[in-house]
Amino acid sequence: MTSRERVVAALSHQEPDRVPIDLGAMRSTGIMAIAYNKLKRHLGAAGDTRAYDVVQQLAEPDECILDRFGADVVDLSRAFFDRPDDWKPWPLPDGSPALIPAWVDPEPDGRGGWLVRAADGTVIADMPAGVHYFHQACHPLEDATEPREFADLAAANAKVSWSAMACAPWHRPLTNPEHFADVRERALKLRAGTDRAIMGALGGNILEGGQFLRGFGTFLEDLAARPALAEALMDRLVESYLETIPRFFAAVGDCIDVVQMGDDLGTQTAAQVSPAMYRRFIKPRHTVVYEAVRKHFGGFIFLHSCGAIAELIPDLIDEGVQVINPVQTSCVGMEPERLKREFGRDMAFWGGGCETQGVLRAGTPEQVREQVRERIGVFGAGGGFVFTQVHNIMADVPPANVVAMFEAAQAGLS
């Protein structure tokens, strides 16, 4: 089987020749650049480290590393990593070197950390000394009281770190004809040059989109106490996504196998909102967005949603979601056996292969291998599983554990 065939078979709930593997095909299955530098030293690999996601400090895995670990999927944004003028040098928080996208401009904060400003000077992201991520520092619609204040989402999103510091191809609008043509050309080149499956990030966040714009607590208050205001913002988000979806798939739809949607619905112990509130406010809008995706795309719909979301999975299946990530198995109700038993016929699992909050960070290589074998035994039965760790590999994960994890994934149950 080719890598692409392996992924398609698994997501179609068929057992491939081995469980497919992902390292860095989207921004929650990757490795932090600090950890990646350590891994390269451990393996004797040379070359620059490219931190393509500046917010989360994620590295683009080199081809030699993808080959070494048997990776079967790549990120569409990889198509934008081949031109030297797309990159510039920048020191990581531990002082080790990296390259970052040329369109992102962190500046020293004068206290040993970094910040990023919008065009008008507003600080939209900060990374204090000793911290390994940029935090969102501005919720541009936090003080809005009327729906009319939601009209210009583009201006608001220019002050949201996640969109203002976006990864390719979202660093420029697809409404720009030159950028659209460039995205199309690069996507075709990437498709022709690999037999790996390709994932393209689209987003479509509803709950999270409201939280980015209004503030996490404020938007939850809106849903409970100001529902008309919350619905007005969510409807405006849906409108913007419906404008983007046809353009995105016209550019890359025939070059990708999986489209990555996103909406963090959970916490460590429960969903952020009750099932009743989800079904009233979020589900109808998710459904509209995912139906629009399906109208333009014949591949797999993948949803990244952190946390304890088991009670919402039946709704996600009903909406048309086919793949869930990161499968945060340490959260309440997210036990692998339960997830596979109750939802494995209709939902594929992309993640859950090794606990980043536990054994991957603090265990021994043999403990890592043991957990990987256990997870493949549960999630991999009958297909419906792409192996990757739970969310990103953190800066303090020992490189020997990373190697042990991917070697065990390649070996499977043998």
What feature does the model see in each segment?
Residues 1-41, 45-49, 127, 136-414:
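Active-site loop segments of alpha/beta catalytic cores
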Residues 2, 70, 92-95, 264:
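Residue-level detector of functionally special positions within alpha-helical transmembrane segments
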Residues 10-17, 66-67, 107-110:
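Short, surface-exposed loop and linker segments with low hydrophobicity and enrichment for Pro/Ser/Thr
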Residues 32-84:
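Segments that shape or occlude catalytic/ligand-binding pockets
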Residues 64-68, 96-98, 105-108, 188-193:
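Short, charge-rich binding segments
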Residues 73, 115-117, 197:
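Ordered hydrophobic segments in well-structured contexts
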Residues 78, 82-168:
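A contiguous, low-structure linker/loop signature
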